[in-house]
A protein has these predicted regions:
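Structural signature of tandem-repeat unit edges
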Residues: 1-7, 17-29, 39-52, 62-75, ...
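Consensus positions within tandem repeat domains that build extended binding/scaffold surfaces
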Residues: 9-14, 31-36, 54-59, 78-80
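Acidic, glycine/polar-enriched metal-coordinating patches/loops
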Residues: 84, 105
Length: 118
């Protein structure tokens, strides 16, 4: 993706059946349903500078085992991380606002999600 890209629009990877790993650099916003219903994806790495995860931006990815989030997140919609793999690990910078936001989002999930401070 071009370095100048700052926003991943709504539904950018919706239902991407071949997507196995996603590492995006330089973005500030992920729109709604960006990584939704991607059955083969296992890992997502998002860059420092990312400020917002939209509604259900990462959801319904049953084989997703690891998400790496930056310290710069200011907003994470409450519907993120739902319907992903049991045992999902969300890697966050220890003590960051991102860690606080993620812990709040996962409070009501009905399966095992682990926050991994690094």
């Amino acid at each position: 993706m071009p370095e100048s890209l700052k926003i991943i629009e709504d539904q950018a990877f919706l239902g991407a059946t071949a997507l196995r790993k996603l590492e995006i650099n330089g973005i500030e916003t992920m729109g709604d349903y960006c990584i939704y219903g991607c059955p083969k994806i296992k890992e997502v790495r998002l860059p420092e500078g990312l400020k917002e995860l939209g509604e259900s931006a990462i959801e319904n990815c049953e084989n997703l085992t690891d998400i790496y989030l930056p310290s710069t997140l200011e907003t994470i919609d409450e519907y993120n991380f739902d319907l992903c793999a049991d045992g999902l690990k969300i890697h966050v910078p220890a003590g960051s606002n991102t860690e606080t936001l993620v812990r709040k989002v996962i409070e009501n999930l009905e399966y095992n999600v682990e926050v991994v401070p690094e």
